[in-house]
């Protein structure tokens, strides 16, 4: 297997581990969020789970199609309990995912996988939307009280 393709597969497996972690993190956050924000944030966290699992499914399929073996292990998952920290952990996760996908997009371009480049751009757009929504939630001064 070409070394550049192998590096791409390794990166995609790292991305996959983080998508698993994001789905678990959002599931955890939906369960533990409490107080006045629970009624608003629980559905928000729950709505993100399917997006992250959709990304994980795509990554798994692509890794296998490229000749790799999809990981079954999730990346480390923070477990904050306060509303602000739940949102901040999610925000950091989304930012890191965008950065990883930008790197993966460059790797895919280098080996000529246009379909993967296009899908990564779509996933970057999804993650950017998640990031912006969390930033709006964090801009509420009551979250910081």
Predicted regions: what is each one?
Residues 1-145:
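Iron-associated oxidoreductase/ferritin-like identity signal
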């Amino acid at each position: 297997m070409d070394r550049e393709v192998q590096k791409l597969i390794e990166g995609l497996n790292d991305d996959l581990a983080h998508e698993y972690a994001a789905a678990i993190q959002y599931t955890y956050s939906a369960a533990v969020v409490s107080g006045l924000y629970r009624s608003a944030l629980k559905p928000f966290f729950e709505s993100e789970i399917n997006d992250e699992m959709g990304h994980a499914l795509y990554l798994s399929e692509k890794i296998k199609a490229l000749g790799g073996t999809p990981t079954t292990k999730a990346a480390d998952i923070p477990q904050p309990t306060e509303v602000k920290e739940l949102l901040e952990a999610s925000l950091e996760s989304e930012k890191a995912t965008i950065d990883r996908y930008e790197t993966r997009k460059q790797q895919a371009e280098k080996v000529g996988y246009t379909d993967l480049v296009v899908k990564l751009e779509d996933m970057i757009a999804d993650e950017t939307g998640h990031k912006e929504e969390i930033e709006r939630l964090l801009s509420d001064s009551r979250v910081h009280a």
